């Protein structure tokens, strides 16, 4: 009993971080939860972000999405130079709303099949909210590279867009995309009806 209580306490005090390794999800670490009060963003940004996520996770919101036949998911874009707090913001939101984090590392070697496997392999059997993180999306979906034909990506834009549109997302997915420079990204990714908040 004491051991089970210790495990439960550990889970309550930490955020589980999973990492996709080409074919499967592996737990990368458990990081201490970070109080929302320690998150410092530009004026109004923290309140706007937390209100959006809070509203998304409400049962009434889920019911509304499903009543209109819409995929129940939310996509948020965070952008800024390395070291500006994108990862910290995601960890803090995960802490505040008691979510697991599932990180998909974006590389030119990531295939369509691997991306679909990543989304379909997220554990939704537990009564646990989850955040999916697609990091540095601008590193492979760069509009200038696509114009020149230099992207050489195994992951196609069409598959990524299907993931963002919710067709391969688990129900209730809160998805964060990060980018160093949102201005270089393909406009098909950042159009307003695909990104709920940026």
Whereabouts are the PLM-identified features?
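AAA+ P-loop ATPase mechanoenzymes
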Residues: 1-63, 72-74, 107-110
């Amino acid at each position: 009993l004491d051991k089970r209580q210790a495990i439960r306490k550990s889970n309550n005090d930490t955020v589980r971080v999973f990492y996709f390794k080409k074919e499967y999800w592996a737990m990368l670490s458990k990081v201490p939860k970070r109080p929302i009060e320690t998150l410092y963003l530009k004026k109004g940004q923290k309140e706007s972000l937390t209100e959006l996520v809070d509203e998304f996770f409400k049962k009434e919101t889920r019911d509304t999405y499903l009543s209109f036949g819409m995929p129940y998911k939310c996509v948020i874009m965070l952008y800024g130079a390395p070291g500006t707090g994108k990862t910290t913001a995601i960890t803090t939101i995960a802490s505040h709303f008691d979510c697991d984090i599932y990180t998909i590392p974006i590389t030119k070697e990531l295939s369509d099949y691997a991306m679909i496997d990543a989304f379909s392999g997220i554990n939704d059997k537990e009564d646990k909210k989850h955040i999916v993180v697609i990091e540095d999306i601008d590193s492979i979906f760069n509009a200038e590279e696509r114009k020149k034909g230099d992207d050489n990506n195994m992951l196609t834009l069409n598959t990524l867009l299907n993931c963002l549109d919710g067709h391969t997302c688990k129900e209730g997915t809160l998805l964060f995309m990060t980018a160093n420079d949102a201005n270089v990204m393909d406009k098909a990714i950042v159009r307003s009806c695909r990104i709920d908040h940026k």
